[in-house]
Amino acid sequence: MVQIIDGKAVAATILEKVTRETQDLKANGVTPGLAVVIVGEDPASQVYVASKGRKATECGFHSVQHSLPENTSEEELVSLVEALNRDPAIHGILVQLPLPKQIDSERIIHTIAPEKDVDGFHILNVGMLGTGAVTKALVPCTPAGAMLLIEGVRGKDLSGLSAVVIGRSNIVGKPMANLLLAANATVTIAHSRTADLPAACRGADILVAAVGRPEMVKGDWIKPGATVIDVGVSRIPAPEKGEGKMKLVGDVAYAEAEKVAGAITPVPGGVGPMTIAMLMANTLAAASKASGRDLPAF
C-alpha cells in the first residue's frame, strides 16, 4: 500500500515549532522580522505575498510588506533592499519574483544581505550549499521542504540510495541535488537533454520531479517502492468537472504512479505547503543567528 506523504500535516508541525521558538526569542527581546517586497500588480504574486505575510503574522513575526508600482526603477528597488539590509528589526528579506523587465533580478538578489536572504538565492548561500556547508546556508525553501518529506520516509542518512532529480533550475533542481548529496545519496540530475529519461528514472529509490510539465512522469518510469516527490504544479483542463473547469496536477501522472511507488506526494497538498513553512523556518533561523542563539533544528 502506497504511503501518501501529507505535506500539509508536516508543514503544520514545522509552523507550530516556529511559533514556539518565536515565543522564546521574543521573551529574550528578539522579534523575528520578515520584509516582503513586491513590484507590480501580477495577481499570482499578490496572492503569494499575501499568504506569506499572513503566515508570518500567525507565527508571531514582525511582518512588513513593501508594494511598489510596475514602473519602479532598478535603482529604486536596490535602495529599498539596502535600507532593509541596514534595518536591525528585519531578519529576512524576500523580493517576490518575477520582477518587471526593466529590473535585473540577479542584481536584486545579490543586493540582499546573505544573512537575510531567506529565499536562499544569494550566491553565498548557493555556494555554501554547493560545498556541503548545509547548516551554514539559508537553503531555498522548496527543496528544503521536499528534503524534510524525504527524511520522513527514508531517514536523514540516505547512504546506498539512488536519487534522480528531474530538473536543473537554480531554485529547485540544483539545490535539491546538493541536499541529497549532503545526505549521502548517489545523485543524478536529469533534464530535457537527458537521453532516455524514463530509463534514468527507473533506477531511482528517490525520484524528485521539478520541471513544470504536467503528468510527464509515467507509472512505468518509477522503480517499485520508490519515494516520489512531485514539485511541479500545473493547471490543466478538467472536462470531467464540467465545461471550462480546470484542475491542479503535478509533473507525475499520479493515478499511475501511486500503484508503483512506495511513497508519493500529492498535488496539491504535498510539497506546496512545505515551501511557505520553510520560509518561516528560514526567517526564524536568520533571527536566531543574528541574536547569537542556537539555530532551531527541523
From Swiss-Prot:
The keyword Amino-acid biosynthesis applies. One of its GO terms (molecular function) is methylenetetrahydrofolate dehydrogenase (NADP+) activity. The keyword Metal-binding does not apply. Keywords: Amino-acid biosynthesis, Histidine biosynthesis, Hydrolase, Methionine biosynthesis, Multifunctional enzyme, NADP, One-carbon metabolism, Oxidoreductase, Purine biosynthesis. It comes from the Bacteria. One of its GO terms (biological process) is tetrahydrofolate interconversion. NADP(+) binds at residues 167-169, 192, 233. One of its GO terms (cellular component) is cytosol. It catalyses: (6R)-5,10-methylene-5,6,7,8-tetrahydrofolate + NADP(+) = (6R)-5,10-methenyltetrahydrofolate + NADPH; (6R)-5,10-methenyltetrahydrofolate + H2O = (6R)-10-formyltetrahydrofolate + H(+). Its EC number is 1.5.1.5, 3.5.4.9. Belongs to the tetrahydrofolate dehydrogenase/cyclohydrolase family. Catalyzes the oxidation of 5,10-methylenetetrahydrofolate to 5,10-methenyltetrahydrofolate and then the hydrolysis of 5,10-methenyltetrahydrofolate to 10-formyltetrahydrofolate. Homodimer. NCBIfam families: PRK14188.1. This is Bifunctional protein FolD. It comes from Chelativorans sp. (strain BNC1).
